[in-house]
Amino acid sequence: MRDVQSEKDHRNIPINMVGIKGLKYPIIVMDRTNKRQHTIGTFNLFVDLPKDFRGTHMSRFVEVLDRHNMKVTPKNMESILDDMREALKATVAHVTVDFPYFIRKNAPISGIGSYSSYNCGFISTKNKEFDFILKVEVPVLTVCPCSKEISDRGAHNQRAMVNVQVRMNSLVWIEEIIEMVEDAASAPIFTLLKREDEKFITEVSYDNPRFVEDVSREVVLRFMNDPRISWYRVEVSSQESIHNHEAYACIEKGKSL
């Protein structure tokens, strides 16, 4: 049978990244409370392709992923990348995976429990060195300090999304990232609240107003004081309740204006 993919290509143009995108696959990730958590990952898997190869072997990406028995950890990601490079005779391999991560949270006053979902992901590359980034998206509540200052009654508040990316020297739990981000906001967000909880969150957030600038800086302060975190990028986007636009702030370690 003719192997078209392995034929020589004469256009003399290498390809930086080729592979499969948007593959949904069951995965197991580490969980601080329960040791492991089953979820669904959406994968992008790419390698480089030399200038004289016409095509890559798409089926091998799935074969490599399947061999790892659904385990997706920082350590195992490097093993997946190494296997991809070997199976596809590549120099560079890239894997990104996005997944929902669930945490059991208790309401602040009633103590009633419910699950909260967070969009998380890993970004990994292997060339000569292994690079791994953890990303976590955390919804929080913000109250506008300016609105509070100038108003006789109340202040406008809204949900804000904090998108965090970190490189680590040693393990930082997803739960720890979420806790640091929630602590930097006016108040955390819960899936289930009773009336006494709503009262508490409303009053706590009012007493702790935050601009997007405040939230981004407060998150970064916590990252700077954690020796396990070697690099970070923090983006805060506030869904302004009294405007038809969003407020935005971004801080990245090592990036100048």
Curated annotation (Swiss-Prot):
EC number: 3.5.4.16
GO molecular function (one): GTP cyclohydrolase I activity
Pathway annotation from the record: Cofactor biosynthesis; 7,8-dihydroneopterin triphosphate biosynthesis; 7,8-dihydroneopterin triphosphate from GTP: step 1/1
Signal peptide: none
Keyword Hydrolase recorded: yes
Stored InterPro entries: GTP_cyclohydrolase_FolE2, GTP_cyclohydrolase_FolE2/MptA
Keyword annotations from UniProtKB, A to Z: Hydrolase
Spans traversing the lipid bilayer: none
Keyword Transferase in annotation: no
Marked site (May be catalytically important) residue numbers: C144
Catalytic reactions on record: GTP + H2O = 7,8-dihydroneopterin 3'-triphosphate + formate + H(+)
GO biological process, one term: tetrahydrofolate biosynthetic process
Source taxon at top rank: Bacteria
NCBIfam families from the UniProt entry: PRK13674.1-1
Function field: Converts GTP to 7,8-dihydroneopterin triphosphate.
Family: Belongs to the GTP cyclohydrolase IV family.
Protein name, entry field: GTP cyclohydrolase FolE2
Gene: folE2
